[in-house]
């Protein structure tokens, strides 16, 4: 007999611990947005590990719109996320494909901006992001998806740095849903540090 699956709260707590230990750093950093910060979050050590990917797939899937047929995101941060969510959906017997949005059109072949099984025009797509600061990466992905004819109204991120990203996304008629806010990850990192 296999053990019972962990509760959603246990998964959420484990994911927060993993992000605090493996993704969060305190120091002096220049962010992708060009801003300076004392906090840095690189989710890839978690999103590129098998166990982290499993946790993220389940956690993010919960916030994908029920009528979405795809999840998509800008390469590179969203690549493992869209794959994990599509797999978690399949395991839950839900059809949900993954798309990767290129930062620029492919320079050969089809010159495509999007990679993956393309849904019909007008389909709803939920955008996934690892970290939202200003919202620039998400907005670039959304722009390409909307220009291709897809309906995008929600962005789901692992961490919202709370530095204007939500406001920028709201201005583009997008709802931002975050698993965690930066202060939650930073606080958990401090707690874990004092425990050792």
Swiss-Prot record:
Orotate binds at residues 133, 161. Keywords: Glycosyltransferase, Magnesium, Pyrimidine biosynthesis, Transferase. It comes from the Bacteria. It catalyses: orotidine 5'-phosphate + diphosphate = orotate + 5-phospho-alpha-D-ribose 1-diphosphate. Pathway: Pyrimidine metabolism; UMP biosynthesis via de novo pathway; UMP from orotate: step 1/2. GO terms for biological process: 'de novo' UMP biosynthetic process; pyrimidine nucleobase biosynthetic process. Its cofactor is Mg(2+). CDD domains: PRTases_typeI. InterPro entries: OPRT (IPR023031), Or_phspho_trans_dom (IPR004467), PRibTrfase_dom (IPR000836), PRTase-like (IPR029057). Its EC number is 2.4.2.10. 5-phospho-alpha-D-ribose 1-diphosphate binds at residues 102-103, 106, 108, 129-137. GO terms for molecular function: magnesium ion binding; orotate phosphoribosyltransferase activity. The keyword Magnesium applies. It is an enzyme of class 2 (transferase). Catalyzes the transfer of a ribosyl phosphate group from 5-phosphoribose 1-diphosphate to orotate, leading to the formation of orotidine monophosphate (OMP). Belongs to the purine/pyrimidine phosphoribosyltransferase family. PyrE subfamily. NCBIfam families: pyrE. Homodimer. This is Orotate phosphoribosyltransferase. It comes from Prochlorococcus marinus (strain MIT 9313). The lineage of its organism: Bacteria, Bacillati, Cyanobacteriota, Cyanophyceae, Synechococcales.
């Amino acid at each position: 007999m296999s053990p019972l699956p962990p509760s959603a709260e246990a998964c959420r707590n484990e994911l927060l611990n993993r992000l605090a230990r493996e993704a969060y750093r305190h120091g002096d950093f220049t962010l992708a947005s060009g801003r300076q910060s004392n906090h840095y979050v690189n989710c890839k050590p978690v999103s590129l590990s098998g166990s982290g990917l499993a946790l993220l797939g389940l956690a993010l899937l919960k916030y994908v719109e029920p009528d979405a047929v795809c999840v998509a995101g800008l390469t590179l941060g969203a690549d493992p996320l869209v794959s994990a969510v599509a797999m978690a959906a399949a395991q839950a017997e839900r059809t949900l494909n993954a798309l990767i949005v290129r930062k620029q059109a492919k320079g050969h072949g089809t010159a495509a901006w999007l990679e993956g099984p393309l849904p019909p025009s007008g389909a709803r797509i939920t955008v996934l992001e690892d970290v939202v600061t200003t919202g620039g990466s998400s907005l670039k992905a959304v722009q390409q998806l909307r220009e291709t004819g897809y309906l995008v109204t929600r962005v789901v991120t692992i961490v919202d740095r709370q530095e204007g990203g939500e406001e920028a996304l709201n201005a583009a008629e997008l709802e931002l849903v975050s698993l965690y806010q930066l202060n939650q990850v930073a606080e958990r990192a401090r707690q874990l540090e004092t425990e050792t």
